[in-house]
Amino acid sequence: MKSPAPSRPQKMALIPACIFLCFAALSVQAEETSVTPQPPDILLGPLFNDVQNAKLFPDPKTFADAVPNSYPLMILADYRMQQNQSGFDLRHFVNVNFTLPKEGEKYVPPEGQSLREHIDGLWPVLTRSTENTEKWDSLLPLPKPYVVPGGRFREVYYWDSYFTMLGLAESGHWDKVADMVANFAHEIDTYGHIPNGNRSYYLSRSQPPFFALMVELLAQHEGDAALKQYLPQMQKEYAYWMDGVENLQAGQQEKRVVKLQDGTLLNRYWDDRDTPRPESWVEDIATAKSNPNRPATEIYRDLRSAAASGWDFSSRWMDNPQQLNTLRTTSIVPVDLNSLMFKMEKILSRASKAAGDNAMANQYETLANARQKGIEKYLWNDQQGWYADYDLKSHKVRNQLTAAALFPLYVNAAAKDRASKMATATKTHLLQPGGLNTTSVKSGQQWDAPNGWAPLQWVATEGLQNYGQKEVAMDISWHFLTNVQHTYDREKKLMEKYDVSTTGTGGGGGEYPLQDGFGWTNGVTLKMLDLICPKEQPCDNVPATRPLSESTTQPLKQKEAEPTP
């Protein structure tokens, strides 16, 4: 079956209709076979609320991760009987009735390790195995071992894992890559989608959809067999993201799908629940109370949906960058998400062809082509000269430049002339001494200036290289690696995020202290080390001078700073 010509839109519409009906069936099948564990705020009701509001623990995630020692209903009944008694001690009650998460052992690396040796030594430290969990544990079991980010993040996270897996592959740990792909496929088969992380309280949302890219990565080692093996799960994930599309009218939205007035289909981030997040309970309640002009449930949904984006939180989602309570994630069509959906459609087409289903391959290709046109039409700001998010309320592309603008280049969805403009905008507005800024706005949120994040550095580097912008790509990698190296030289750690306004300093902002470990930084650092150093002369540390330079970029001086405690 040949893909219909672009000049005949009436037939193009028939193909998506057919394919979406198939996906609707897949989605229903996933829901019917799934077992959905209840999150702790539902299991424990008023007890959960009271413990979190009492701020018994510095990190609210601690109690969200605590395991009840008996049936939650029995614990709740005991609490109701005891809570008004004289001398009742809530902390003692929690200690008796729950097993609190243990602090991970402090990893002390051997003296004299290079950056590469340190990362290679961290893989077993960050590996977890949870084939079985306690009945009421919020942790969801997975059949294979997996690598966690580190620090307070004791579970596997969806989009983090892709960049971690890049590093595992670079280290030759293809068995771990295969294990993690198998785990995510298991989650799709069990829950109908890949949750934010393997916790019951993350099941109501997903994260940036990298599963198809993970399968594509595994196919580099296993060939088309990997594509064919995981085609059913990729189709199910696509069904999850497109759930509800068959009933949409022009100008409507349903869950994660948006249908614009001209019929263009795009996606947004969404969480199925509209309550405070268990892992950030008190903070979310305070945010909602701080804006009485909006329904609390609306704010909760937008907070949760921002967590689904991975960018929690950023001025990108807010009307007022200084007020988190003005975020409205669900009314924004993100450029990075739709780039990933385009890539998913392209990989689904490739996998279908590998499986011998050329008709289905053509249908996915048609969907990818339509989405690419939508990206170019709605997610490009011609006045500013960069890709940006689309605002469903104003019906306009937004003006803000963020590092997400590089995603169309990363997935090869950008027009060549626009890629050139993106290179100029990136170098002019986002490139800093220590890497790529997330945005140019200083809001105090962690996904804003001056923070830089490893996954965004890699997306920008690869995206610019895809379009021949090698000098800007090399500048980004070199600046970020220098930052990582300077921090490592002083702290002997790799950080979750970095201050890119200088070098040698971890990032700030956000709802929790800076975390070290750190899965995706490890992965991106290895990829960048192998990018800037020739294969015949691999480097274990960042070189003192910028390799392969055709620009005037000079080695960066290390910032004098005190070690973080």
Swiss-Prot record:
The keyword GTP-binding does not apply. It holds the Pfam family Trehalase. Residues 538-565 are annotated as: Disordered. GO terms for molecular function: alpha,alpha-trehalase activity. InterPro entries: 6-hairpin_glycosidase_sf, 6hp_glycosidase-like_sf, Glyco_hydro_37, Glyco_hydro_37_CS, Trehalase_periplasmic. It comes from Escherichia coli O127:H6 (strain E2348/69 / EPEC). Residues 1-30 form the signal peptide. Its EC number is 3.2.1.28. GO terms for cellular component: periplasmic space. HAMAP family: Peripl_trehalase. Substrate binds at R152, W159, D160, N196, R205, S206, Q207, R277, P278, E279, G310, E511. GO terms for biological process: cellular hyperosmotic response; trehalose catabolic process. This is Periplasmic trehalase.
